[in-house]
Amino acid sequence: MASSVTGDAETAISADSSTKRRGGGWITFPFMIATLLGLTIAAWGWLLNLIVYLIEEFNVKSIAAAQIANIVSGCICMVPAVAAIASDSFFGTIPVISVSAFISLMGVALLTLTASLDTLRPRPCETASILCQSPSKTQLGVLYTAITLASIGTGGTRFTLATAGANQYEKTKDQGSFFNWFFFTTYLAGAISATAIVYTEDNISWTLGFGLSVAANFFSFLVFVSGKRFYKHDKPLGSPFTSLLCVIFAALRKRKAVVSTNEKDYHNESITMPTKSFRFFNRAALKQEDEVKPDGTIRNPWRLCSVQQVEDFKAVIRIIPLALATIFLSTPIAMQLSLTVLQGLVMDRRLGPSFKIPAGSLQVITLLSTCLFIIVNDRVLYPFYQKLTGKHLTPLQRVGIGHAFNILSMAVTAIVEAKRLKIVQKGHFLGSSSVADMSVLWLFPPLVIVGIGEAFHFPGNVALCYQEFPESMRSTATSITSVVIGICFYTSTALIDLIQRTTAWLPDDINHGRVDNVYWILVIGGVLNLGYFLVCSWLYRYRNLKDDDHKQAANVSH
């Protein structure tokens, strides 16, 4: 795989000297990927083990810790939308990434202080004591400040890096290759964090573990800044949301106007006629008296829009139903991330006589399987499908496959948890602890299945948004997936709270609960959501599906 990238780099650089002069191209690849690697190691280094840190060092109850972690994850996923707007509208991607990486560095450094200074943490719980000292307001204030800074910095770089990296290339094929490497590096870095850093936190010290995250963040910041002279610096095109609002207002102003079938009646710049879908908004581009200056420019953008603006608006509208389906796809995954850690804490995590798997490291199974199947998909499955059918596997098809794997994973996890609860009911524990005499390895199969699903649906969602959104919203487009996932973390937090209020399935001690029933509810919801997604996919028509090396497909079968 690495040799493929090297070959692409040599070809691209030698074939297009003009790219060198204006920046961009494969010469930027090592800087972008190294930055991504360091920032992701830093972010996952503290985030993956946050639940355990809150429980062990800040005496937070297990379900409450899981909900806090979900809220933090949701914030990290929502910040990319703000970063994208700042990039598209005001500053460009490169400055936003630089500032965000520095903010992340400050947050992780402060979090390291909470681990190293005893005054910033409550006293640990005494052995066999039910009552534990709660953290003070000052201690919580410092902790939440650190988490907030780290979350803002992480969110500000996550998908902005994807856009900045893709913007360095002219060809769709090269952009697609970068996206594959982007996700591969993301999950590889997560795997490094989930093993080396989480193990350090659990078995050596939290200070050293968080310190390694600080070092990784500092390294990535230096690498990114040092590569600035090679980058293609994208110019902000103004707020894309203003353009979308103009379409709405212009269409409403002309709501009584008759939609014309004559292209001369529309203000066009590149597209001559608006499409027939969402015909009401075609009125926004309908020319009326004194709306166009003699030089052909628009007098008032809130009264008249171009056909291109109208079609860009329609593109965003078409994506919304699919985004809703993704919310219900990712909510179970968000819940599983939290509940798996709690399950791992009450299962036998021993491997051999002296090694014990950290509960926060369980997610490495998902990360590794995602990494592996991104490569398998890119090099084996997708080329085989193309050779077999003569068509590319579309982004929506990839997302649909991810839906199916997600449902399967929830079902398998429910079966595993039911087996664990039977062992608990029989009183089979390790010694006098509350740890069931059941190996944590039973959780590996469902985690692998989740990883396979993510290898399909996550890159598929990002590719869909990047290719279907207007060019002026490229940064916003790649952040949409992150925003949807952020909503999912909030949804999962609300769902956990609802289940706690209405059932006895999720007590603080899950040995006395029914987590398996929670997973079965998620399976039912997943099946219904898959049906909804298939209907939306069947009705959707691609706007920009193309490949540089093949003829463009006018109609794509879903």
Swiss-Prot record:
The keyword Transmembrane helix applies. Pfam families: PTR2. Keywords: Cell membrane, Membrane, Nitrate assimilation, Transmembrane, Transmembrane helix, Transport. Its main location: membrane. One of its GO terms (molecular function) is nitrate efflux transmembrane transporter activity. Disruption phenotype: No visible phenotype. The chain crosses the membrane at residues 31-51, 63-83, 90-110, 140-162, 178-198, 204-224, 319-339, 357-377, 399-419, 440-460, 479-499, 518-538. It comes from the Eukaryota. InterPro entries: MFS_trans_sf, POT_fam. Expressed in shoots and in the cortex of mature roots. Not expressed in root tip meristematic cells. CDD domains: MFS_NPF1_2. It is a multi-pass membrane protein. Induction: Not regulated by light or plant N status. Up-regulated at the protein level but not at the transcript level by medium acidification. The keyword Endoplasmic reticulum does not apply. GO terms for cellular component: plasma membrane. Belongs to the major facilitator superfamily. Proton-dependent oligopeptide transporter (POT/PTR) (TC 2.A.17) family. Transporter involved in a passive nitrate efflux. Not competent for chloride transport. This is Protein NRT1/ PTR FAMILY 2.7.
